[in-house]
Structures are given as C-alpha cells and as structure tokens.
A protein has these predicted regions:
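Proline-enriched interdomain boundary motifs that mark the N-terminal boundary
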Residues: 307-316
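Beta-strand-rich modules
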Residues: 369-399
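Conserved aromatic anchor
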Residues: 322-336
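Active-site neighborhood of glycoside hydrolase catalytic domains
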Residues: 72-82, 86-172, 176-226
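Substrate-binding cleft of secreted/luminal carbohydrate-active enzymes
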Residues: 183-209, 224-304
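Active-site-adjacent "subsite" loops/lids of carbohydrate-active enzymes
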Residues: 2-5, 11, 17, 27-87, ...
C-alpha cells in the first residue's frame, strides 16, 4: 500500500479494459465515507489520508470514517471521484450504502464538535442529511463536468423509511433505514436528478416478516422518479445457516418472476459474484438456460442523451450458397462514438418492428467498435432468415437498422 506495483501496472485500467472487452460496463463501486475498515487490523500506509489529515476523521466502533460534516473531507472525496472520471473510461460511479454508518447500540456517532462548529440552525438529524445531500450534489456535478455520459448510481439499503414514520414510506419494519439512520434521502436525490439509478439491496426473501422482498420491490418501482432501478439480490444468503428460505431453489427464480412484472424495473445486480462460484441451488444453470438465455442490451438513459449514432457501414457483401459474408465499419459521420454492434436475426418476411424489442431476435452483440468481418447463414434447418445490424452508442442508444442484404456505400 502506498507504493506503485513493480513492475508497474494499473489495476483499475486493467479491470476496465477486460470488462469492456467482454461487452460489459464498468461501474466503479465506492464507499463514500469509510476510510479504515478495522482499526488495528487494517494495514495503513504512512502517506494514507487518515495519517495526513487525522482531523478529517471520526472513530466509530472499530472503523474510521471521513467526518461527513467536514467540508474539506467532502471535497477530498469529490476530488477522488473527479480524478477517476477524468483519467479512466468508467461507465458509472456507484456508491455503496454506507453513508453515515449503521448505528451501534448504545453508541452515538461522535460528530458533536463538528455540528457545533458548523453553526447550523438545523437540528442534528436534518444537518446530517444536509451533509450527505451536499456531497451527492457535488459528486454528481463533478461527474457531469468531466463526462456527461458517465452515470451516477447508489446502492441503498432496502428501506428508505418505514410507513409508520412517513406515509410515503414502505410497508416494512426495518430496525434502521436510509433516511432516519444513515441520513441518506434517496428519494430526494432521485427527484432532484442528482443520481441516474438506484440498486436497492433487497437481500431478504419473499414473505419476510419485516422487510419482504415483494413489498419493497413494488415500493421502489413506484418511487424511481423516472430513473433506472436495478434490484440487488442477496444470493450470498444461500450459504447462511439461518437463511432457510434462501436454500429453496425456487427463491431466486420467484424473485425474478416478480421483478419482471414491473416494466420500470430494468434488471438485477447480484451480491456477490463469488457466490456463483458454488453454483448455489443450481442457479447458474437456471439463469443461463432460462432467465438470461438471450443477449441483452443495457437500457439507455434518455435524460443523459437520446442521440443515435449514425448507422453502421456495410461493404464487401457477398453471397455463396446460403451464406452471406460482409464487412462492418463504424459510421464515418456523426458525433456519437460506437461501443459495439448488434446483429439481429428475423424469420424471413416477418415485419421487423414487431420483433425489434424482443431479446430472442438478437443473434449476437459484437464488441469490436472499429469494425469486423462476418459470415451468416440465411437458411438453417429449413428456416429462412434475414439479418439487420445496428450500432450502439456510449449511452446504449441504437442507430437505425441496416439490412445486411443492402450495400451501403461509404
């Protein structure tokens, strides 16, 4: 820690490159305030910010946190985010649920001196929320100043507020909530357009007596303010002895079936990826063969940009028997960079606009933004097909369809 690797390599650059090679997006996941995970056990370099600016930090439990009420500490975090967006081609900045820390029974977060210095006329609860609001606004602004295409997302704890505290809250009985305990007013951030998506951590099961998956799923679907929602699934729980319902092979499939009843819920995120190494409950096979059997495009965010890339350029189209071969190049005109191409396959003679939004029609997603050569079969097992290609821009907006049978001159 505190020293560059020898021989030098950049882990973040490596991760982004390998992610993009696979047609995936890279969302840089950050904890906004947590600075030292376990006091006495975490190895901290001499030049670490906690050593250089100890007055910026507060000790709570066995962890050290940036003081959310310290403006210099806030600016440091904002500058880190700005640096990432400026120097690396990330697709999004993603904040974890740790804003003010989860409460420890019998211990008050030690920010009384910071509150007194602030001179705020707000009560301490509202002052804490205003501190978190301030850093969210500043991070959002910094991201968009550096690159308007980079998104800003939050992965909040499952409950914004319980209904017994606020009629806008969810039908839940969470012991701690975003608004009242972590001082994270997620709904405000969505409403004010400070963030682009939320990934609520719905890590408990269907029918839970206090925080039921199905109730929170419906609540978040109604409170997105037009932004994207990706549901967080707690698949790690299959390995917990006390999580009996997560040992049921039907739990995750049932969650996905419920999720897909809400058109404004765009997808899922799983915590954590290492759980899939064990193929829990056979879910790897179930997901691959049933729920995710077709390729999918990341949904575009219209409030960022609706601009389409120009259509791809096809050349050297040739037919030999039932095989058609051709070359694809990125468009030579237009201001929208291309990240990939999509090849669609339709039954010959079918009206394509009725099928374009069905993932089963995606033949392949080709992550070669500089172009590629391709050969396709126009007839297989007696069925005839027609192919079309689109270019996909950085905000996941597709170009117009180009039929493969037509040669588009450069």
């Amino acid at each position: 820690q505190g020293k560059a690797p020898v021989p030098f390599w950049d882990p973040l650059a490596f991760m982004i490159e390998e992610t993009h090679k696979r047609g995936m997006e890279f969302h840089a996941w950050l904890n906004p305030y947590r600075a030292v995970h376990t006091i006495g056990k975490s190895s901290i370099a001499a030049e670490h910010i906690t050593k250089r600016k100890p007055e910026w930090f507060l000790l709570y439990g066995d962890k050290k946190y940036f003081d959310p009420g310290n403006k210099d500490a806030q600016q440091f975090v904002v500058n880190v985010v700005r640096d990432i967006v400026k120097r690396y081609p990330v697709d999004a900045i993603h904040m974890d649920d740790y804003f003010y820390p989860y409460r420890i029974a019998g211990k008050e977060f030690p920010d009384a001196a910071s509150y007194a210095r602030s001179g705020s006329t707000l009560n301490k609860e509202d002052w804490r929320r205003s501190n978190v609001d301030s850093i969210i606004v500043a991070i959002s602004k910094a991201i968009k100043e550096e690159n308007k295409q980079v998104r800003f997302g939050i992965s909040p704890f499952s409950v914004w507020r319980n209904q017994d505290k606020d009629p806008r809250g969810s039908d839940s009985r969470a012991g701690q909530t975003n608004y009242d305990d972590l001082y994270a007013d997620i709904l405000l951030w969505l409403e004010k357009d400070w963030i682009d998506y939320v990934t609520p951590q719905l890590y408990l099961e269907i029918g839970h007596d206090k925080i039921a998956y199905e109730k929170l799923l419906e609540w978040w679907s109604k409170n997105a303010f037009g932004k994207h929602i990706y549901i967080g699934h707690g698949i790690y729980r299959f390995d917990e002895r006390t999580s009996v319902k997560w040992k049921n092979p039907a739990e995750l499939p049932n969650q996905l079936k419920l999720l897909r009843q809400y058109p404004n819920v765009q997808g899922s995120i799983y915590f954590s990826s290492k759980s899939f190494d064990k193929n829990p409950n056979g879910w790897n096979d179930s997901l691959q063969n049933n729920y995710y059997k077709y390729p999918a495009l990341v949904p575009s965010m219209d409030w960022i940009s609706k601009e389409k890339p120009a259509a791809p350029v096809l050349s050297r189209v040739a037919k030999k028997g039932e095989e058609i071969s051709f070359s694809v190049k990125p468009p030579s005109a237009g201001n929208v960079p291309v990240k990939c191409f999509v090849i669609y396959r339709f039954p010959a003679g079918r009206f394509i606009t009725t099928l374009i939004n069905q993932p089963a029609t995606i033949f392949s997603i080709v992550v070669k933004p500089n172009g590629f050569d391709q050969a396709l079969q126009q007839r297989e097992k007696g069925d005839a097909y027609q192919y079309y290609i689109t270019a996909v821009g950085m905000n996941n907006v597709e170009s117009d369809l180009v039929p493969v049978t037509t040669v588009v001159k450069e």
